[in-house]
Amino acid sequence: MLALRQGALLLSARGGQTTHDNLQLCAGPSRRPRARWISSAPRPSTLVERHIRPQASTASDATTSTSQRILSIHDVDNGQILGFGADLAEDHPGFHDPAYKQRRAWLAEMAKTHRIGTPIPDVEYSPAEVATWDAVLEELSGLLPQHACREYLRCLTLFDFRKGRVPQLEEMNTVLRSTTGWTVRPVAGLMHPRHFLAGLAFKHFHSTQYMRHPSKPSYTPEPDVVHELIGHVPLLADPAYARLIQTIGLASLAADDKQIWHLTKVYWHTVEFGVVREGDQVKAFGAGILSSYGELAHMASGAAALERLDPFRPQPRMAYKDGFQKRYFVLDSFAEGSELLSSYAASLGLPESLRGDASVA
């Protein structure tokens, strides 16, 4: 999960109450470990813009040293977090819920201890968390078939998304490894953009596992497991989209801090809130649209402006506290987006061997 706080995911959803306990990692009947929630007693997160907006005043200040370069997936640190676990903003729905914060903290700790190449432990989601998942599926079921792009709808059938259970990250990997070779890896919370984007270069998408607070199933102030699974994961199984998102990651390998900030905004306007042409219509492929009933309906209404993506131009600010998006950036196809971004990566000095569909995983 990139260190960007999502706006409200406006979903008309069912509520629910829950009793929280502590979590324990234990062996289940399956071959994968699972996480169980068992009993025990029980500073606002800072926005990414505040942390990584470049402050450099000279060219030498703005460059990234060789020691900072990320050269393999093993250099990508999923512990590079700007905010996670129980570190919730005061206006977060779970801020005054100690048990919820404790559960978030435990899930964060579990994510931080995960090692590349090892199975991801299952999380045993509570009945209230499952009810939240169910509510989101119910709301989106009427809009996604009409307004999601064809690649998303095709890939969605590959995953066991249904009411009654929250899918596990390791299940996602079983599908992704057999289709595009991608891997989902757990992360504790809001990940630093340099490390998050670099993970994409090596075909690794970092995902949270925590659920939004049950008191407001229609809203999450940051990406949660609902957003990650419904919004991001399905399209990672599409080769053309997978190449597009990997190209953003590849560009980051050659980027200095100022360019990382620019790429973060490119990511926002494509991977989070991008749309693609299908005939005389535009369809959603951005995860922030696909996982939000309200944003999806807003996109479909035609109320927002449509603009062509140009990664060479300064990108508008990322709107995450102003309600729905005022504009969406349009691609003619994922292949077109990959070509644009590959050209941008070349302008940063990325070696030709790492451009396009080159595998660096």
Curated annotation (Swiss-Prot):
- Name a single GO biological process: L-phenylalanine catabolic process
**Which chemical reaction does it catalyze?**
(6R)-L-erythro-5,6,7,8-tetrahydrobiopterin + L-phenylalanine + O2 = (4aS,6R)-4a-hydroxy-L-erythro-5,6,7,8-tetrahydrobiopterin + L-tyrosine
Its family remark reads: Belongs to the biopterin-dependent aromatic amino acid hydroxylase family.
Q: Does the keyword Oxidoreductase apply?
A: yes
* EC code: 1.14.16.1
Subcellular location(s) per record: Plastid, Chloroplast
GO MF annotation list: iron ion binding; phenylalanine 4-monooxygenase activity
Which intervals of the chain are annotated as region Disordered?
47-67
The record's section on InterPro entries has: ArAA_hydroxylase, ArAA_hydroxylase_Fe/CU_BS, ArAA_hydroxylase_sf, Aro-AA_hydroxylase_C_sf, Aromatic-AA_hydroxylase_C
The name this protein carries in UniProt is: Phenylalanine 4-monooxygenase, chloroplastic
Q: Where along the chain is the transit peptide annotated? A: 1-55
Q: What are the disulphide bonds in this sequence?
A: none
Going by the UniProt record, its keywords in alphabetical order are: Allosteric enzyme, Chloroplast, Iron, Metal-binding, Monooxygenase, Oxidoreductase, Phenylalanine catabolism, Plastid, Transit peptide
- What SUPFAM superfamilies does this protein's entry cite? Aromatic aminoacid monoxygenases, catalytic and oligomerization domains
- Gene source species: Chlamydomonas reinhardtii (Chlamydomonas smithii)
Q: Required co-factor? A: Fe(2+)
Report the Gene3D superfamilies cross-referenced here. Aromatic amino acid hydroxylase
Q: What does this protein do?
A: Catalyzes the hydroxylation of L-phenylalanine to L-tyrosine. Can functionally complement an Escherichia coli tyrosine auxotroph.
An example Gene Ontology CC term for this record: chloroplast
Binding locations of Fe cation = H227, H232, E272
| Regions of compositional bias (Low complexity) in chain numbering | 56-67
